[in-house]
């Protein structure tokens, strides 16, 4: 069995998954806005505490972490929606948890999961979009994830749709994500 961790802009979800992709157990926590150091500490403590708890209950072979933004094999290069940059999460967790830990962009993880176990498994090619705190995406060609290296994937949320548009947290102007969020906020009011 494996532990999957979804580190979102507003929550952390930790689940135990069997070899068929079935979620056996799931734990969730909402994240509150805080400064970077507090967020990092909160994330680490929550993951370590719950991973250890789940490892006592199940035989866990590895842990996978899905996070929005740009990541490499062991750290978050930049996650705009979480306010994280150069965060060595894998190194920090490995000192407390003795199983292999992998990290990948959340949209890529979701696309792989849907292509393997979910609604996309009967398709050879697909474009997968994630809509949450931000907007992300991934492309599947011939049942394989389009490799974008350490780049985030198809982060359409940070593609500029208006040259001199609204300033985004990423530092650019006119990001698609800002306009979708504004539309969503208008509907809520």
Feature-to-residue mapping (PLM):
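Short glycine-aspartate micro-motif
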Residues: 2-6, 60-64, 126-130, 169
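Conserved Rossmann-like nucleotide-cofactor binding loop
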Residues: 10, 22
């Amino acid at each position: 069995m494996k532990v999957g961790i979804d580190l979102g802009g507003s929550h952390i979800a930790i689940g135990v998954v069997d070899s068929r992709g079935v979620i056996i157990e799931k734990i969730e926590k909402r994240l509150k806005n805080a400064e970077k150091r507090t967020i990092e500490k909160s994330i680490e403590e929550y993951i370590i505490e719950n991973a250890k708890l789940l490892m006592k209950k199940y035989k866990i072979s590895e842990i996978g972490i899905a996070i929005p933004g740009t990541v490499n094999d062991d750290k978050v290069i930049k996650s705009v929606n979480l306010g994280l940059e150069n965060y060595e999460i894998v190194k920090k967790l490995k000192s407390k948890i003795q199983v292999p830990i992998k990290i990948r962009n959340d949209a890529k993880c979701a696309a792989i999961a849907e292509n393997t176990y979910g609604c996309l498994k009967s398709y050879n090619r697909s474009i997968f979009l994630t809509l949450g705190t931000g907007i992300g995406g991934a492309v599947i060609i011939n049942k394989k994830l389009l490799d974008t290296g350490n780049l985030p994937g198809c982060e359409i949320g940070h593609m500029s749709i208006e040259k001199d548009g609204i300033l985004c947290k990423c530092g650019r102007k006119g990001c698609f994500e800002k306009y979708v969020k504004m539309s969503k906020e208008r509907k809520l009011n």
